[in-house]
């Protein structure tokens, strides 16, 4: 589970986790514990160390300890007596040394995740509590944590945010003491290079040596916010900022401000030169030393030629991050980084700081732990490691290292790959949203596999190359839904689906491509044939159809022949031309309902009539398509052919864009929009049916009686289209209660992908189906926005999903009647 998914559930109870990393979309709970994560607001008061209540731990000797058990201390003594005794001895030694207590206290007065948490020996008296808190931030070197219980903190739901821009970095950091006195939840620092990378609106100010502080105040009750804002604004006005910054509570504006800060790492790392590695460092210093530290860091960047380096971070805690890009394949540049690191370490330690504040020691800082803590405290850390892991089997070389150059060894290279994915920073933001994450691979892993293939090719390792390429056919290509949701989560805007369709293009044979090219030329007839096939199949005993279907899939391959199943709808009917003397819009009925029987198109037509709106269709509608079937399969020629025919018909039918074009299935709407994206001269306006219904139909119809409850399944396409508000508006118009499962996600039916690989849809829908079952409620309707998604969700849940327009039409009547 990630921090975001856990917090989404806690929010219902007005609570949240203490640690609040900026990368909460990807941070797993295990990683948060392993690194002693903190974040933007929690500081050291509500970090993992302070809020972890208990954990179940697997030790190196195979024993399991649950620190939540009432006799856990006795269990630890019995199951790991040497460890228990060593921890007790260290506790006694430290307690008898005021000088050690003083130094440990100083080290942990600031954010500090270097080495092991020696503050455990000061903060806790029982051995089991010391044991638990040593595990926090130990990065898997002391044991494996399988379960954990946290103490949560109040969720402060009301906030005001501003971006204060200063003349230079020194002015920004000098304002910190004054700002901290106003009790903000967060103060985020961004230097000039960060502002440039984040493309900050400087409100007419020419960017020179400027720096900014993102300041946010959070309260639990809305009534408190006005007074907090007024008091803070008075202070802000005296800070000498170069902009007229105003605190805002407006969600959109606040999100835009935070987007600048949260996207900085990826913006800089994503723009790096191909083949280079992005390194994000994380240090903390006393607040009084922050200004000089930042200025001296900038001097180091200049000295060593890191011209694209940026500084940003949690200024309220004296915790800054800086990022440099390096090409470690070049020995001279690798040596440059080594020299820079040595000077950076000296700089931070000379300021009384910590070389790691919240990211964990890892391998990169392991050689410098002793330099920060001194020989005596470092020796205690070595004893801790040996007591927990006598054989040294747990993450060797991490956190504790005898190799002074371990940070320069085993560097991960990023060989150039396909341009569409080459700037991936492997942050993992895309992973939680990927429908194939529990079946095969995620977007990040697909890209990593491409890098592994490139490395094997470069190294001439033909055996490994062949193995990787073969494995990638299923794990990378065949089980990717190509839904594009990864792009919505990716801070550098990578759509891994485009990478996958490129790979599919390379694999497609000439015969296969020609068949689909012919289908594009005769699409209406092709749809009729598919529809007839579905209807004929229903007349034949299922055992015969299933056997024939299996044989075809075995012979032609599961990528070519869909798996037939009894729950598939009947075949649909051909789309027919409809004319109007004074149309209000063009209805582009999708070809999905020519394949499968459905009521969505007729419902949209009916609702339009009830609302008093007239429509027309392209005369050749039966032969048109958005092109998604070809595009998703990497069939370039067929895609161009069908899209060109569709575009010409829509230009004519819409009177060159005068009339909006409405499509009833969200995936087809999104497909149409993508198809015309590259046409800079296009005047076409494509609107999804739920947006159209919310804006133009709903005001002109009545819903005499609402349903009691409905549940929604947003689709990947409706999400990419930004149609969720319209979806909820329609749902609230027809139901007293509307809910969306927290675990909703792309169903991965993806046109025919769920029929080609039903295991993909089964995996993708498992969590959402389980969430619905857990609610234990029978809803009056199960609603979505796309036909194939409705098929996939019906299959997963056993409930009859339908398009929301069908439900609206059944309840609606004209306001004129």
Positions of PLM-derived features:
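Short glycine/threonine-rich loop-to-helix capping motif typified by GTGT followed
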Residues: 196-208, 255-264, 321-336, 365-377, ...
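Activity-critical C-terminal alpha-helical subdomain
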Residues: 267, 367-416
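Iron-sulfur cluster-binding electron-transfer modules in prokaryotic oxidoreductases
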Residues: 389, 496-817
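Iron-sulfur cluster-binding cysteine motifs and their immediate structural context
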Residues: 393-398, 429-452, 479-506, 671-672, ...
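Non-heme iron-sulfur electron-transfer modules
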Residues: 400, 406, 437-472, 493-519, ...
